[in-house]
Amino acid sequence: MKYGNMKKWAPLILFLFSLLLLQGISLHASSPSFSVNASYLASLPYANSHVAVVYYQGSLYIIGGDSHSNQVWIYSNGTWNIGPSLPFSLVSPSAIVYNNTIYVMGGYNSTGINPYVLKLNGNSWVVVSEMPLPAYSPYIFVYNNAIYVIGGENTTSPAGLYFPPSNAIRLFYPNNDSWRIIGYMPVPTYGGGYVFNGTSLIIVSGYIGYSAYTNDILIYSPQNNNWTILNGVLPYWIHDSALAYYRGVLFIVGGYIYTAGSGGVNNAILAYYNGNLQRVGYLPVPVYSAGYVQVGNMLYLAGGIGSSLSDVSALQLITFNFPPLPPKITSYSAGNESVTLGWNPVRLSSGYEIIYWNNMGFNSSINVGNVTSYTVTGLKDGITYYFEVLAYNSIGYSSPSSIIALTPASVPNPPQLVSVKYGNDNVTLNWLPPTFSGGYLLLGYYVIVKNENSMVSSHFVNSTSLTISNLTPNVTYNVFIYAVNKLGNSSPLVLTVVPITKASVFAFITKLGNGILVNWTTSFPANITLELYNPNGNLISQIAAIKGNSSYLFRVPQGNYTLVIIASNSAGVSKYVYQVVYYLPPASPQVSLIGFGNNLYISWNNEANVITYLVYVNNSLVYEGPSNSIVTNISNGTYLVKVIGVNPAGSSSPGIAVIHYTGDYVTVVKMKVVNVTIVSKIASAVSGNGNNLSLGQSIVIILLAVMILLSIAIITRNRSNGFDW
């Protein structure tokens, strides 16, 4: 289905309404030095119009259009290939290349105006966003990492075409697929030719609504969101033309023209420059509503609507031929009776000419051909010559380059840098003598040191090496080295130095369960060596030649250590010493109690990382030491026992046990043990954690067994004597 038929006839319909409003304007101008060539490059796979065209990865992409509206064709090296199809049909879309991919916006189809933003992802299209205030054929360009989408037609209804098109200035941000409306056009236009020249959007003519067109040129500056209107530039109204901008000249190609009393498809190529408009060429196939894209000094037109108001299949190429831009001399040196010049290559140039002269009435020129360096010979030593380079092609000559003044055998060539070595707040420079001494013996070298535009120091040396001291680290200095002979100084060898100093180390030490983690940074680049010593001063680990900021984990047991960090660079060696107390807080001990014969036997398990234990009985300290059992005297009463493990990292939570004791060493029948049963409880207490019995615990068990036997004997005797139990 051809959705574009409405658009083909819209210009003619609107033209009939606008004839009474048109006023003629006549412009006359002389042509600058350029020419325009237009050629029929190839045929599209089929006739089409209202397509979008981009230049992507060295190929032309023809997107959508009035025919086969979801198809994409790729033209490369004279061959057509089918590209990735659009997910839906699009007539009059706009497309742009950004960040090495293609974005397609706007357009319409049988369902209405397309609001979706398509992005080429590999070999398929994906929808990444929706356009606010959707429109087709908007003006689209990239500036400052945003895609500007301006104006466009906002209706597909033939009746609605009478009203003004969209005037919104929309910004799309590809980094997060978001939109923002930042303003509005002073004159809403649709179908005007447009081009973005890198700093400004230029729109020529276009439909403004109410059956009216404009013959103005609108210029939009995205830098400040401002518009400039050049009123009445065109002698007629023109719709759906193609635009290009090159070397300060605006080219208007094709389009549908409305003049006083008539209209038709334009075959002219117009140039607007210096406030003047002039026809400079003709299209092989007159068209309007063609897709187009500018690539350098070339403009490609794909398809369009021809003179019979039907689609055409022409792919046309318009080439804008200008004289080259002036070259820039990039290198120069004086030799013995000679001067060597080098310059940058200039696009569109077919050759170069050197013009040179002196102040004694001599002048000459040399056509050196298509090269970018040349040695002029036959000069006289001691005489100053002036040189400039021009580029040329079939259109004409460029402006001359900047003038370079050189005197053969007058002063030396500049020295040649060998090395720069940074020390502690100093820098040592080494260089070679110049390749040409100027024809005289070298007297020495001037070395000038500047900080921005301020003189820091100056030196005159007879050697090819110099150490510059008392420099401030991290400050940029410019150093100029001149070779000197009796006629003067060479041009300088210029270099930039940023002095350094010995690196400071900033360390962060973290105590982990599996070792000591050391993180560090340095104030200047340096090689790092880590050394870890035990309390006896013995080196137990060394990690050498670590470059850059990093970290390292020492897997060592808990204890006291000395960490040494050594930072070395060309400025010297820095050493930093850290005392590391590597302990983790201990766990709470498990306490066992036995009361027997006015003695309280207290024991506990050994906890890892404990250096000493504190034992409290009824909040009185009765023991401090490394043992895991003690014996203390008690009398009748209740006893609260706390055992606390201690190391340099801190104290554990207390292990707590309670016993209520009655009786004495002889009479134990009234003894009551709280939390600890007699033999079986003791056995479980000493063996439940899987540890071997200590000597103290073994003695306690033996004594307890004896006392149990003694108690049984006493009980038996008392019962036989009639005592109460």
Swiss-Prot record:
Which controlled-vocabulary keywords does the entry list? Kelch repeat, Repeat, Signal
Organism source for this protein? Saccharolobus solfataricus (strain ATCC 35092 / DSM 1617 / JCM 11322 / P2)
User: What highest taxon heads this organism's lineage?
Assistant: Archaea
Stretches forming Kelch repeats: 59-100, 101-145, 146-199, 201-248, 250-297, 299-342
Transmembrane segments in this chain: where?
Answer: none
Give the signal peptide, or none: 1-28
Q: Does the keyword Repeat apply?
A: yes
| SMART domains in UniProt | FN3, Kelch
What protein is this chain from? Kelch domain-containing protein SSO1033
Q: Which residues form the Fibronectin type-III domain?
A: 323-410, 411-504, 505-583, 585-665
- What Gene3D superfamilies does the record tag this protein with? Immunoglobulins, Kelch-type beta propeller
